[in-house]
């Protein structure tokens, strides 16, 4: 078993999907958290100056979704066929497109809150309805893959602080808690 060290800020953010995968697969890893005050000194030492970084036996991997795909590739999380893998990638990329629209770096709290609220009120319900429609009556999003609604939906909900605005009205609570 390789040795894993995940390097990210002391927050959920882009490393959270990696942590979910480690937890789901019961893989032990070092969760190295960087404080914001230390970032200016650390940034120039990293590939492309970005995190998260996953060290695998000393080799640095970067880009959160590439890392997630690497970890999921040899499990049932990534899909069993190339077609299923493409479907998994499409769902993950759809969620990433949505999450990338949030103003995470906005410094002005009132503007940040307004932008968050607009995305949650106007856009999140459509995304969640699309995911609900895509899932339909199936148990899984993709084939019989364990890449299930829990991992997908929790990825979004872990970032949405105001989930009560949409939970229950646009997607059933049981799907979130599954």
Which residue stretches match the model-derived regions?
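GST-like domain detector, emphasizing the conserved glutathione-binding G-site
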Residues: 1-128, 132, 137-141, 165
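GST superfamily/GST-like fold recognition
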Residues: 88, 141-178
């Amino acid at each position: 078993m390789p040795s894993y060290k995940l390097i990210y800020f002391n927050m959920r953010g882009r490393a959270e999907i990696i942590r979910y995968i480690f937890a789901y697969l019961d893989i032990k890893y070092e969760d190295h958290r960087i404080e914001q005050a230390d970032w200016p000194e650390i940034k120039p030492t990293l590939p492309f100056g970005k995190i998260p970084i996953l060290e695998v036996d000393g080799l640095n991997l970067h880009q959160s979704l590439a890392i997630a795909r690497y970890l999921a590739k040899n499990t049932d999380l990534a899909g069993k066929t190339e077609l299923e893998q493409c479907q998994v990638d499409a769902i993950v990329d759809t969620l990433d497109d949505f999450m990338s629209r949030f103003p995470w770096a906005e410094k002005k709290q009132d503007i940040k809150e307004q932008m968050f609220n607009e995305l949650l009120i106007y856009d999140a319900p459509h995304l969640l309805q699309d995911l609900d429609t895509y899932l339909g009556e199936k148990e899984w999003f993709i084939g019989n893959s364990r890449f299930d609604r829990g991992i997908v939906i929790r990825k979004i909900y872990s970032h949405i602080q105001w989930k009560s605005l949409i939970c229950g009205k646009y997607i059933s609570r049981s799907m979130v808690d599954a």
